Amino acid sequence: FKRLHETVDTCFSEDFINIIEKRCIDAAAANVGLNVHFSYTDNDKVIRESEWHFKTFDEYIELFTDYVDTEQMLKFSDSIMQVWVFPDNGINVGFVNGAECSRGTHIRAVRNEINNAISAYLLSKEKIDITPKNVDGKYSMFCTFHVNNPSYDSQTKECLTTVVEKFSNDSKYTFKVPDAFIKNVLKSEIVDIVIDWYKQKCEVEDQKTLRKLNRQAKTKIRNNDKFIDAN
C-alpha cells in the first residue's frame, strides 16, 4: 500500500473487512481445534485483530445467541454430519469439509426428511393437509458435513451437488435423520409454528372467498330488472 500511496481504508471497504473476518471465524468453526488469527493492519498499525478457536461446533452457534434460542435447539449427529435445527424463518448455515456451503444436496437431504415427517404427522394427527414445501420456511438449520470427494456447481463451492448415496465412502453407511430426532421435532415449537401459519393461511383464503361472494351478490342485485307494478 505504501508504494501505491494508498491506505487499507481506501482499498478495502468496511463491509469487505467484515466478510474477511467472518471467513476466519467460519474456518475456525468448521475445523474444531484450529486456531485462526485475523489481523487488519495499515502501515504496520493494527486496526483490528482477533483470534478464534472452538472446542466444539456448539461454541460457534453460541455466537448467535442473540438471534438463536439455544433452549429450543435440537441436535443429532452421525459419522459424517452434525445438525442443529430451531424454530425460525428458514435460514441455513452449513459447512462441508471445513468450508462454508449453505446450499445443496446436504441441506435438502436433511430438510426433506424433516419436512415430510411434519407434513405426514399433521395430516394424521391434526387432519391438516400441508405440503412439505410449506413446512420448509418454519425452522432454520446449522450443519457441518464430511463428504467423500464432494462436487459443487461452481468453483466457489457454494452449492453441493454430490448425490446423497455418495456422501460416505463406507458402503454400509445409509443417510438417515434419526427417528428419535424426528420425534423431538414433532414435539417442538416448529410444529406449532406450522399450524399457526396454516390457520392464518386459511383465514386469509376465507376472507378472500367472502369478499368474492359479496361482490357476486352485489353484481346480481345491480343486474336485476327494475320492479314493474302489475297494475
Give the residues covered by each predicted segment.
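GHKL-family ATPase ATP-binding module
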Residues: 1-231
